[in-house]
Amino acid sequence: MNNKRHSTNEQLSLDEINNTIKFDHRSSNKQKFLSFLGPGLLVAVGYMDPGNWITSMQGGAQYGYTLLFVILISSLSAMLLQSMTVRLGIATGMDLAQMTRHYLSRPIAIIFWIIAELAIIATDIAEVIGSAIALNLLFNIPLIVGALITVLDVFLLLFIMKYGFRKIEAIVGTLIFTVLFIFIFEVYISSPQLNAVLNGFIPHSEIITNNGILYIALGIIGATIMPHNLYLHSSIVQSRTYSRHNNEEKSQAIKFATIDSNIQLSIAFVVNCLLLVLGASLFFNSNADDLGGFYDLYHALKTEPVLGATMGAIMSTLFAVALLASGQNSTITGTLAGQIVMEGFLRLHIPNWLRRLITRSLAVIPVIVCLSIFKGNAAKIEQLLVFSQVFLSIALPFCLIPLQLATSNKDLMGPFYNKTWVNIISWTLIIILSILNVYLIVQTFQELQG
């Protein structure tokens, strides 16, 4: 990576929200924290999107609480990587897409852009599928109609944006806590064994020695670090009004943005643990092989003998509501990430509504085509979701490596470059994640062919 300085005519990242939310570095720590509370919520959404649900609940259903340790390690890794994106955005005034385009040669940057766009589409496919299935479960709306309805989310986002970025953060936060409280309630009703849950956070050798557990563990790790989140976070932290030329204010902004990120990712960690605990407490040692998708989980909850007819109906309905909330949340953040990638790599100046409509349409089209070919077969649609998650694994190194190279560059980052211990941990994470993702991709295609 060369050391060209940031050009003065660089377009602001997400310029309609950039530098719009007040941050007073002279205020109390409480006020500073509240000023920066919000971007982490949008990032946390990617760690509990519909694409993560199946892996966590299947892991619990098939292997009990063993994989809670993997969720813990994955979440801690995510916190480190997201803190690096915070420093990149605040220290340089560029998001990850802008930085990649600006500091890499044009041919390489174009390759990275194509992969980033495909990753955004893959992310959006999971949200479209999750929302369409939730609408089908709740209101019996055909899957094709449900997928088309999700296009309207784009215009809803445009409408909300007129009232400021804080409104988006508030709506996302409300939906996140809706999902959180639903699963707290469902786990409470399912009565898990506390000692067994706590034991799950201790590493077990079976995670490595048992191929089945290892496969699910890789799925959890691969689904935890989402490429679009790295682009998103490096942009939306710039929505606050800290001085772009004062290192003291930048330092404070980095501090409170990182605290915000870690708090929200802790909530995502709890949600993923709750999903696994719910799967383990209700389905471990029974029906685990039948929990292949959202419909299987919905009907398993509805007919679970331990719950009874009334509570089973409530639990399954709440599951569908949480799925819809998660899908809508991820729709908002995925659309924003699509805008960041398109603007950052291409410097395209097109109307916001058109840019967001293009992003969503590119995700809806493959879902509609798949539904048409397979005549609404839910299993085939859920298989498309699996393919989308596999592609995210392929795309991951193409944003992690530029992030690492940029944040370890003293000329680019100034006093906010990575310390040695951060470089050691982050490079180790990148290498391990890349190896595990390659293994996961190979295993997934072998299973699909088998």
UniProtKB/Swiss-Prot annotation:
<feature type="transmembrane region" description="Helical">
    <location>
        <begin position="170"/>
        <end position="190"/>
    </location>
</feature>
<comment type="similarity">
    <text>Belongs to the NRAMP family.</text>
</comment>
<feature type="transmembrane region" description="Helical">
    <location>
        <begin position="383"/>
        <end position="403"/>
    </location>
</feature>
<keyword id="KW-0812">Transmembrane</keyword>
<dbReference type="GO" id="GO:0015086">
    <property type="term" value="F:cadmium ion transmembrane transporter activity"/>
</dbReference>
<comment type="function">
    <text>H(+)-stimulated, divalent metal cation uptake system.</text>
</comment>
<feature type="transmembrane region" description="Helical">
    <location>
        <begin position="34"/>
        <end position="54"/>
    </location>
</feature>
<feature type="transmembrane region" description="Helical">
    <location>
        <begin position="212"/>
        <end position="232"/>
    </location>
</feature>
<keyword id="KW-0813">Transport</keyword>
<keyword id="KW-0406">Ion transport</keyword>
<keyword id="KW-1003">Cell membrane</keyword>
<feature type="transmembrane region" description="Helical">
    <location>
        <begin position="108"/>
        <end position="128"/>
    </location>
</feature>
<dbReference type="GO" id="GO:0034755">
    <property type="term" value="P:iron ion transmembrane transport"/>
</dbReference>
<dbReference type="GO" id="GO:0005886">
    <property type="term" value="C:plasma membrane"/>
</dbReference>
<feature type="transmembrane region" description="Helical">
    <location>
        <begin position="263"/>
        <end position="283"/>
    </location>
</feature>
<dbReference type="GO" id="GO:0046872">
    <property type="term" value="F:metal ion binding"/>
</dbReference>
<dbReference type="GO" id="GO:0015293">
    <property type="term" value="F:symporter activity"/>
</dbReference>
<keyword id="KW-0472">Membrane</keyword>
<protein>
    <recommendedName>
        <fullName>Divalent metal cation transporter MntH</fullName>
    </recommendedName>
</protein>
<keyword id="KW-1133">Transmembrane helix</keyword>
<feature type="transmembrane region" description="Helical">
    <location>
        <begin position="305"/>
        <end position="325"/>
    </location>
</feature>
<feature type="transmembrane region" description="Helical">
    <location>
        <begin position="422"/>
        <end position="442"/>
    </location>
</feature>
<keyword id="KW-0769">Symport</keyword>
<dbReference type="GO" id="GO:0005384">
    <property type="term" value="F:manganese ion transmembrane transporter activity"/>
</dbReference>
<feature type="transmembrane region" description="Helical">
    <location>
        <begin position="361"/>
        <end position="381"/>
    </location>
</feature>
<feature type="transmembrane region" description="Helical">
    <location>
        <begin position="141"/>
        <end position="161"/>
    </location>
</feature>
<feature type="transmembrane region" description="Helical">
    <location>
        <begin position="61"/>
        <end position="81"/>
    </location>
</feature>
<dbReference type="InterPro" id="IPR001046">
    <property type="entry name" value="NRAMP_fam"/>
</dbReference>
<dbReference type="Pfam" id="PF01566">
    <property type="entry name" value="Nramp"/>
</dbReference>
